[in-house]
Regions:
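Charge-rich, low-complexity terminal tails
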Residues: 139-162
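Acidic-leaning, charged glycine-interspersed low-complexity segments
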Residues: 18-21, 42-47, 91-147
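Small/polar-rich, solvent-exposed N-terminal microdomains that initiate assembly or binding
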Residues: 1-62, 154-162
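Generic secondary-structure microfeatures
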Residues: 51-55, 72-78, 106
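Oligomerization/assembly interface segments of phage tail-like spikes and tubes
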Residues: 64-81, 132-145
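Short structured motifs
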Residues: 33-35, 55-56, 86, 118-124
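Extracellular/virion structural assembly segments
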Residues: 63-67, 77-104
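Short, cysteine-centered beta-strand-loop-beta hairpins and adjacent loop/turn segments enriched
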Residues: 56-59, 77-85, 143-151
């Protein structure tokens, strides 16, 4: 999954220079208040990417195909007062535009030569310290080549009726 991660980090950072941080998600958000945890500081706006799983199937020859699942989180601080009449209600629109731009970049993007990313789920929530999290789950098809000399053979099942 590291091949997906490195590709996506570089792609998002290049296409969205307004982001301060694009990185692998290794718990930075959840450890904001844990001074005992050695981590780089989380600066916003940020995108954190976690390639969480691949469901593999066997293919003939020396490769496997799978469906990869990735969690992508856009993290934005929300210190603006956005109540009606505050004069800063536009901050809500700005956050939505950033979220939409990220999704537009990712939906259909082919990080490798396999299938494009497809969003399957979205969750939006407020986190401590006035942080908004826009989380989306994407899936895509991936193929991994095995080393030479490794191959899969199909198993034939034979039934006889008497």
């Amino acid at each position: 999954m590291e091949f997906l991660l490195s590709n996506l980090v570089a792609y998002i950072a290049r296409e969205m220079p307004e982001l301060i941080l694009v990185d692998e998600d290794y718990g930075q958000l959840e450890n904001l208040d844990d001074d005992g945890q050695q981590m780089y500081p989380l600066t916003t706006p940020a995108v954190l990417i976690e390639p969480s799983r691949v469901d593999w199937s066997h293919l003939e020859g020396n490769s496997q195909k799978g469906e990869a699942t990735l969690r992508v989180r856009l993290i934005i601080d929300c210190y603006d007062d956005t109540h009606a009449g505050s004069g800063t209600e536009f901050s809500i629109k700005d956050r939505e535009e950033l979220r939409h731009k990220l999704h537009s970049l990712l939906e259909g993007y082919r990080p490798l030569d396999d299938g494009g990313l497809m969003r399957t789920q979205s969750t939006f929530f407020t986190y401590k310290h006035g942080i908004k999290v826009y989380e989306s789950i994407y899936t895509c098809t991936v193929t991994e080549q095995m080393r030479q000399g490794t191959s899969y053979r199909s198993t034939q099942i034979r039934l006889s009726m008497k």
